């Protein structure tokens, strides 16, 4: 008794195209009970939960999809990392991004590294956050990233490195010069 996916695909597509997202979610929940091994449905259901602004279920579904190895695209990993951060699990967001930036699935660019640095910062891993802000600063040559790196290094009591980063921020014309000068003086 093999189930046919086609009627479900048509039904879900019809709901989606007529912007009946809640009905599409219900259909996808049914489909997943019948075809739990189909990775496409897991990813779609997670995305549809986000469309209807049920972020907790979206996170739970995409987290489960990830644990089953169903998330294979950069955008899917970044969405899951974002959901972890929004749901106050920045440590998981940081680990996920770090792993997939290292593997090459997620591009090692200033935007993704900045997101990674922010996640480590939110997770209170000051040393890692400072390291990634430093990498972003070297990549972009922007004062604000050197300033963030310097402030975090100072917080982590790595004063010599902090002064180097803060001086670089000043050299590049950081906006809040007074605050940076005060941090160096402290």
Where are these regions (language model features)?
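Alpha-solenoid helical repeat scaffolds
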Residues: 1-186
């Amino acid at each position: 008794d093999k189930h046919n996916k086609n009627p479900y695909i048509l039904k879900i597509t019809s709901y989606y195209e007529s912007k009946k997202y809640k009905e599409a979610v219900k259909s996808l929940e049914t489909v997943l009970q019948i075809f739990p091994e189909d990775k496409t449905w897991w990813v779609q259901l997670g995305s549809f939960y986000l469309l209807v602004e049920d972020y907790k279920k979206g996170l739970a579904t995409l987290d489960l999809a990830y644990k089953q190895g169903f998330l294979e695209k950069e955008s899917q990993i970044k969405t899951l990392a974002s959901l972890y951060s929004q749901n106050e699990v920045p440590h998981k967001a940081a680990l996920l991004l770090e792993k997939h930036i290292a593997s090459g699935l997620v591009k090692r660019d200033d935007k993704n590294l900045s997101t990674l640095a922010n996640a480590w910062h939110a997770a209170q891993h000051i040393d890692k956050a400072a390291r990634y802000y430093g990498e972003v600063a070297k990549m972009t040559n922007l004062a604000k990233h050197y300033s963030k790196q310097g402030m975090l290094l100072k917080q982590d009591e790595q004063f010599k490195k902090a002064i180097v980063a803060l001086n670089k921020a000043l050299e590049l014309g950081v906006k809040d010069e007074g605050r940076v000068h005060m941090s160096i003086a402290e």
